[in-house]
Amino acid sequence: MVEGIGDEFQRSTKHSRERLLGGRLDWANKPETYKEYPSARKVPLPRNFPSSTLSFLEAVKKRKSVRSFFPEPLSLGDLAFLLWASTGIQRAEQGYEFRTVPSAGALYPIETYVIVNNVGGLEKGVYHYNILAYSLEELKNGDFGEEMAHAALEQKICAAAPVVLVWTAVFNRSKWKYAQRAYRYVYLDAGHIAQNLALSATSIGLGSCQIGAFFDEEVNQILGVDGVEESVLYLSVVGHPR
């Protein structure tokens, strides 16, 4: 088999006894942990989370990829719960805010965007989850479902589901400490978040499907990110399973 860029990536980002990737930490230039759109309209998120009738074991047993949804809106409360459970702030200790998922070095390079197709109390559009302010920031108004489906290799569930969650990485948050090995960690971080999302959705009777097939730059354009400093990694649709 002919080697390619993936093989080189795996080889070049290995630790060895002779070489640990990373370097001296430049605390004066540590990247910001949180992203915010100061001029965007903020939608406060409710904290009265839905109750789950499933145990953790039952949620694990029932989780599956769902690709067909009823045309029912998602409630804002359900969306708020999913956002918090997937990557919200769980506790504060020693000056750090820790989240519901692990992250290499507690650097949290992943940002969450929401393509709203059908959520009670929200206009259709593109939103950013402001974790620190526990709110949604409205970035664009309009119906982006078909555009997302087109960008996701014509996967129509991106238009049919009430929401599409889009996870991006702000790479320098991790590269600041881990240099090139950070690229391994950001993908792991996205996976942690996606699994939390999948189990949380199952626990309240919703379904999800994680999506890794998409045209990166088309999704980046929908979000308004540059694809260099910040770029899409992963998607998930969520809705009421048929």
What are these regions (language model features)?
Residues 173-177:
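Short acidic/His/Gly/Ser-rich catalytic and metal-binding motifs that mark active-site loops
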Residues 194:
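C-terminal substrate/ligand-recognition segments
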Residues 1-167, 171-172, 213-242:
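N-terminal accessory segments that position/regulate proteins before the catalytic core
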Residues 181-189:
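Short pre-catalytic strand/loop immediately N-terminal to key active-site residues, enriched for Gly-Thr
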Residues 205:
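Structured binding elements
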Residues 208-210:
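Active-site cores enriched in adjacent His and Asp/Glu residues with nearby glycine-rich loops
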